[in-house]
């Protein structure tokens, strides 16, 4: 186990970490990296070894700026995961599904100057807005 400071330092250096959920939620580990440091190598690693959805966590404010709406008005999933409609970058991609295209989409979304005009909906990468843990762990 690492300290919170060590994890934050690793993320700032562009490294991936594994964050484990609470036992009362999904009780799983998630591969996590700083979105502004993502590249095709990280996307490839996540797709090959994580074998799940590659998602980007955004604040509610950022979702609003990008015009991201919830995938459904009535969230009936067990964990109430707040997925939005998926997106892709409007520029700099081809099919949108390659590791490079997904990294480009993530970088476009987290760009401080990004607007609704920066992205297209739907796209191949899933997004979710920021949700706070129900129990503080740090």
What are these regions (language model features)?
Residues 26, 63, 92-94:
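Short, acidic Gly/Pro/Ser/Thr-rich loop/turn segments
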Residues 9-16, 48-51, 90:
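Generic secondary-structure signature for well-ordered alpha-helical cores
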Residues 28-87:
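A phosphate-binding glycine/aspartate-rich beta-alpha loop in the early core of alpha/beta enzymes
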Residues 1-28, 32-39:
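N-terminal, positively charged regions that mediate nucleic acid binding
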Residues 76-127:
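Hydrophobic alpha-helical hairpins/lids featuring a short glycine-rich hinge
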Residues 127-134:
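Conserved small/polar residues in nucleotide/adenosyl-binding loops
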Residues 6-8, 43-46, 70-76, 95-96, ...:
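A generic local secondary-structure boundary/capping motif
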């Amino acid at each position: 186990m690492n300290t919170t400071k060590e994890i934050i330092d690793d993320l700032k250096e562009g490294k991936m970490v594994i964050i484990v959920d609470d036992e009362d939620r999904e009780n799983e580990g998630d591969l996590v990296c700083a979105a502004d440091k993502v590249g095709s190598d990280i996307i490839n690693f996540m797709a090959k070894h994580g074998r799940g959805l590659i998602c980007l966590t955004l604040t509610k404010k950022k979702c609003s700026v990008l015009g991201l709406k919830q995938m459904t008005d009535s969230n009936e999933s067990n964990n109430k995961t707040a997925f939005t409609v998926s997106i892709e970058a409007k520029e700099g991609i081809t099919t949108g599904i390659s590791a490079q295209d997904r990294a480009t989409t993530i970088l476009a979304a987290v760009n401080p100057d990004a607007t609704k005009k920066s992205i297209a909906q739907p796209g191949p990468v899933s997004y979710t807005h920021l949700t706070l843990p129900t129990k503080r762990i740090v």
